Swiss-Prot record:
Species assigned in the record: Gloeothece citriformis (strain PCC 7424) (Cyanothece sp. (strain PCC 7424))
HAMAP family hit by this protein: HisA
Protein name: 1-(5-phosphoribosyl)-5-[(5-phosphoribosylamino)methylideneamino] imidazole-4-carboxamide isomerase
Protein family per UniProt: Belongs to the HisA/HisF family.
Pfam families listed in its UniProt record: His_biosynth
Length: 257
């Protein structure tokens, strides 16, 4: 399972929000590029960037920080936040971003999601952010009547590369992922699902391994990395590729004596 560090950008700085509340932001670094490099050094294979200003504005805002991070690291970078038209998506992909994450337009303009998935195959991911099973939009400032699982099925049919599922009530809270909701969603679709929100410990990450057969292929970790509750290199060793439970024991010659 892929462990993906999150870097949330607000005013060019690396922050974390509590349950998506912009009034409850905590600055973790003035230099997001250094943060990105740190996660790469600890073994990250992918970075997850969220343009929080962009999510509110409905268009990319932290472009200079995003471009600087993409240039500074040699691993794929995925970006979400405020991507609501083709030009914004193309702009980020032209900067060297590997995958873009669409949220609001998945609810408001599914036809555009289909067009983008066809134009940029493998590079369009849909972020489904849910409050009590219903999809939130516009930087989590609004909640729709659309059910998360229903939207996930529609998006899978449209050809998206993956779905990121965030439980808003758990995001930034360190209360653990919503395992039942993740299982329901992953079982309902045939595209990879990435879990996001609430991871607080290695135990939480290990609990997600049970969902791998259902199609949960990755997990985004934010606050727990910044507070030190989760050590990235340890997490990758525990649940990532080549994790200890996948490695056969070294029997040694004595086993055959």
């Amino acid at each position: 399972m892929e462990v993906i560090p999150a870097i949330d950008l607000l005013d060019g700085r690396c922050v974390r929000l509590y349950q998506g509340d912009y009034q409850q932001s905590q600055v973790f670094s003035e230099n997001p590029v250094e943060v990105a490099r740190q996660w790469v050094e600890q073994g990250a294979n992918r970075l997850h960037l969220v343009d929080l200003d962009g999510a509110k504005a409905g268009k990319p805002v932290n472009l200079s920080a995003i471009e600087a991070i993409v240039r500074a690291v040699s691993i794929p970078v995925q970006v979400g936040g405020g991507l609501r038209d083709r030009s914004s998506v193309a702009q980020l992909l032209n900067l060297g971003v590997n995958r873009v994450i669409l949220g609001t337009i998945a609810v408001e303009n599914p036809q555009l999601v289909q067009q983008l998935s066809q134009e940029f195959p493998g590079q369009i991911v849909v972020g489904i952010d849910a409050r009590e099973g219903k999809v939130a939009t516009r930087g989590w400032l609004e909640t729709s009547e659309v059910q998360a699982t229903e939207l996930a099925q529609n998006m899978a049919h449209l050809g998206v590369a993956a779905i990121i599922y965030t439980d808003i009530h758990r995001d930034g809270t360190l209360k653990g992922p919503n395992i039942p909701a993740l299982r329901e969603l992953a079982t309902a679709v045939n595209v990879p699902v990435i879990a996001s929100g609430g991871v607080s410990s290695l135990t939480d990450l290990l609990s997600l391994l049970a969902l791998e057969p259902s199609g949960v292929t990755g997990v985004i970790v934010g606050r727990a990395l910044y507070t030190g509750e989760v050590d990235l290199s340890e997490a990758i060793q525990a649940v990532g590729q080549g994790r200890w439970q996948d490695i056969p024991p070294d029997l040694g010659s004595s086993a055959f004596a």
